[in-house]
Amino acid sequence: GDVSVVGFDDSPLIAFTSPPLSTVRQPVQAMATAAVGALLEEIEGNPVQRTEFVFQPELVVRGSTAQPPGRVSQVLS
């Protein structure tokens, strides 16, 4: 049977795969901004409470995945 493959992190090396790999892309810029902000607060001597950040990943569909034949696709939001 057919197999769909999904990666994680959207590495720049994915551009060299065949077929192009579908992936889950993390919001690296937002994650880095939050981490650096907390670090700078600590360095400045401000008390930093433990905080849980939730970041929204993005599914990037490329050539390594396909809709199963004969099924209706379901979009998750």
Swiss-Prot record:
Keywords: DNA-binding, Transcription, Transcription regulation. InterPro entries: LacI/GalR-like_sensor, Peripla_BP_I. Gene3D superfamilies: 3.40.50.2300. The keyword Hydrolase does not apply. The keyword rRNA-binding does not apply. One of its GO terms (molecular function) is DNA-binding transcription factor activity. Putative sugar-binding regulatory protein for the alpha-amylase gene. This is Uncharacterized HTH-type transcriptional regulator in aml 5'region.
